[in-house]
């Protein structure tokens, strides 16, 4: 229990992630047990910065990992359409995100969760941001959502 409290304290006090702006939201603040809801992460790369999209070979594409927890079944993560970016020095095309986009994660809340439970869903947004000259160190940014079971 102490570990969980410490983890939540770190998540809630984490500094903003570098090179992007990130906002977490849910499709509903309350959900019936057994119902699937959507968890969103809205990401806006800084000007002149891109993050790699799924399908980028030899690069670290953006990904969302939901921490395991009893009563939470993690569904599919949906990505928007990426942009094709041509990297001149290597003469290659790479899928990236350069403008605001939304990640859409499905989850289902079930047993042992019950009506009245307030659930914090914790996750980590993994990404690597780059500009035209340099790729920055990979980042694992904590993200969380609060949902009440009704």
At which residue positions do the language-model features occur?
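Extracellular/lumen-exposed scaffold segments
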Residues: 10-150
């Amino acid at each position: 229990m102490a570990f969980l409290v410490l983890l939540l304290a770190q998540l809630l006090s984490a500094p903003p992630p570098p090179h992007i702006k990130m906002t977490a939201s849910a499709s509903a603040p309350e959900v019936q047990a057994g119902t699937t809801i959507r968890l969103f992460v809205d990401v806006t790369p800084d000007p002149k910065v891109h993050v790699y999209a799924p399908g980028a070979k030899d690069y670290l594409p953006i990904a969302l990992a939901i921490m395991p927890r009893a009563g939470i079944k993690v569904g599919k993560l949906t990505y928007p359409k990426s942009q094709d970016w041509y990297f001149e020095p290597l003469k290659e095309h790479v899928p990236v995100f350069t403008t605001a986009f939304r990640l859409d994660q499905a989850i289902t809340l079930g047993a042992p969760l019950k009506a009245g439970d307030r659930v914090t869903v914790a996750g980590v947004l993994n990404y690597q941001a780059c500009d035209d000259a340099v790729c920055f160190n990979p980042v694992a940014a904590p993200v969380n959502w609060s949902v009440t079971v009704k």
